[in-house]
A protein has these predicted regions:
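Core structural elements
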Residues: 37-42, 91-92, 100, 202, ...
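A conserved non-catalytic segment of reverse transcriptases
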Residues: 203, 282, 286-354
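Non-catalytic, polymerase-adjacent accessory regions of viral genome-replication enzymes
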Residues: 1-67, 72
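A glycine-rich phosphate-binding loop feature that marks nucleotide/adenosyl-phosphate handling sites
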Residues: 254-255, 291-298, 359-363, 383-391, ...
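Short, solvent-exposed helix-loop connector elements
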Residues: 214-219, 327, 343-358, 369-382, ...
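Conserved polymerase palm-domain catalytic core
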Residues: 74-77, 81-96, 100, 132-297, ...
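A terminal-accessory region detector
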Residues: 380-429
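Duplex nucleic acid-engaging cores and interfaces of nucleic-acid transaction enzymes
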Residues: 113-120, 182
């Protein structure tokens, strides 16, 4: 299997497909399946799946097992199965992920083989749909990010965006209509073998314990292909909003997370009504409690979006003039999640034998990631709070390790020690 320069070859393939799709929005692609089992595409798919890590699926075969078998041999077997039409996906292994509120979120884990085939399929079909996706969509797309979505929201709120429709699509991934999804996919793809793959992944079933469940609704949250399928499905919302909703407000969508920034309450009510109408066309519903219209006018209310809380607050210019500005800072849920992660990585019972340097080494990448995402010019207070929490957590660890009765004694000593040993700070100051 030739794998040299696979990344560049894949980039050229995707660019060609994108430009072809962009030239004609009615063109349907009939020869995509052979791209899925190309050597360079399969190898690039493997590299991406490996980089994403993740545990094994129902077959128990993990990344390390495949490396022991031999990557080239394993990919050649997948290629043969695809070429001969013998590939059949396995059920998705379901695990329950704890949420901050105490409830659980189901997550589907496909086998590594299925993840590779899904990634290869995504490489082949994503450029075609990218040509149709709208500017208001930011989630799980090339060269687009949550930070970009947050910046659009911030600017829209500052530009007389006094009312916000904070929308929550009820159990989106569980309620995607598979037949409608296939019809939307068929608008751009006529290759029956690609469509068969997408359908197979939808009906392969979910294994939870020893119980196999096959549903006619939904797409597995956690699979490689599901974010792209979500964007294909919700592109209908984006297109209809572009056609009918721009006079009501600015739609910003990140996968199924959606907000609409409006200039007055009347527009917000119209926006919500239109959104409910579009959801009905997609066989989806807005959560009756979580979906709400938020007044940003006086700063008494705010909303959460992509881990950030948004609220208009009074600030002061260098000349002492007061004005309102939209502040973005970590939501309560995000703060709670970060603090739990800090505690897990520093103050766990099994970590009492660890060296301080090792704890710092493990925590620093997380701090850098959080800082890159959450740090803004308006949220220094929250970053300082997290820095103090980290200091306190290290202090508790230090005192437990040295069997001191007072958990917060020697806090100054610990603070100096961890920063001297290279601990990163969340705050800029």
């Amino acid at each position: 299997m030739q794998t040299n320069n696979s990344k560049e070859k894949v980039r050229q393939l995707q660019n060609k497909l994108y430009l072809t799709a962009k030239k004609c929005d009615s063109r349907r692609f009939h020869a995509l399946y052979d791209k899925v089992y190309r050597d360079d595409v399969l190898f690039e798919a493997w590299k991406r799946v490996k980089a994403n890590k993740g545990s094994s699926g129902v077959d128990g075969i993990g990344i390390e097992d495949i490396e022991e078998m031999g990557i080239e041999k394993y990919l050649s077997e997948i290629k043969s199965e695809l070429m001969d039409g013998k590939y059949k996906p396995s059920p998705v292994k379901r695990v329950m992920i704890p949420k901050p509120d105490g409830s659980e979120r189901p997550l589907g884990i496909p086998t590594v083989k299925d993840r590779i085939v899904q990634m290869a399929t995504k490489i082949a079909i994503e450029p075609v749909f990218e040509a149709d996706f709208r500017d208001c969509s930011y989630g799980f797309r090339p060269k687009r990010s949550a930070r970009q979505a947050l910046e659009v929201v911030r600017k829209a709120c500052n530009n007389k965006g006094y009312y916000v429709v904070d929308a929550d699509i009820e159990k989106f991934f569980d309620n995607v209509n598979q037949d409608k999804l296939m019809k939307l996919a068929e608008q751009r793809i006529s290759d029956r073998r690609i469509l068969k793959l997408i359908r197979q992944w939808s009906v392969s079933g979910v294994l939870y314990g020893n119980v196999l469940t096959i549903s006619e609704l939904g797409t597995s949250q956690g699979s490689v292909i599901s974010p792209l399928l979500a964007n294909i499905y919700l592109n209908t919302l984006d297109r209809l909003w572009e056609k009918y909703g721009l006079t009501h407000g600015i739609l910003v969508r990140y996968a199924d997370d959606t907000v609409i920034i409006c200039k007055n309450k009347k527009n917000a009510n119209h926006a919500l009504n239109l959104l409910q109408y579009i959801m009905a066309k997609l066989d989806l519903k807005l959560h009756p409690v979580k979906t709400k219209i938020v007044s940003m006018w006086d700063g008494k209310e705010g909303f959460d979006f992509l881990g950030m809380h948004h609220r208009r607050m009074t600030t002061e210019t260098s000349k002492g003039q007061l004005y309102k500005e939209t502040y973005q800072y970590p939501s309560r849920k995000a703060m709670k999640k970060m603090k739990a992660e800090i505690k897990k990585n520093v103050n766990g019972r099994s970590l009492l034998v660890a060296k301080e340097e090792d704890l710092i080494k493990n925590l620093n990448p997380k701090i850098i990631g959080w800082k890159n995402y959450y740090s803004t010019k308006t949220n220094e207070t929250w970053m300082q709070e997290l820095d103090w929490y980290i200091i306190c957590t290290f202090t508790r660890w230090y005192n437990k390790k040295h069997q001191r009765r007072k958990h917060m004694s020697r806090v100054g000593f610990v603070r100096n020690s961890i920063y001297e040993k290279g601990l990163k700070k969340m705050a800029r100051a």
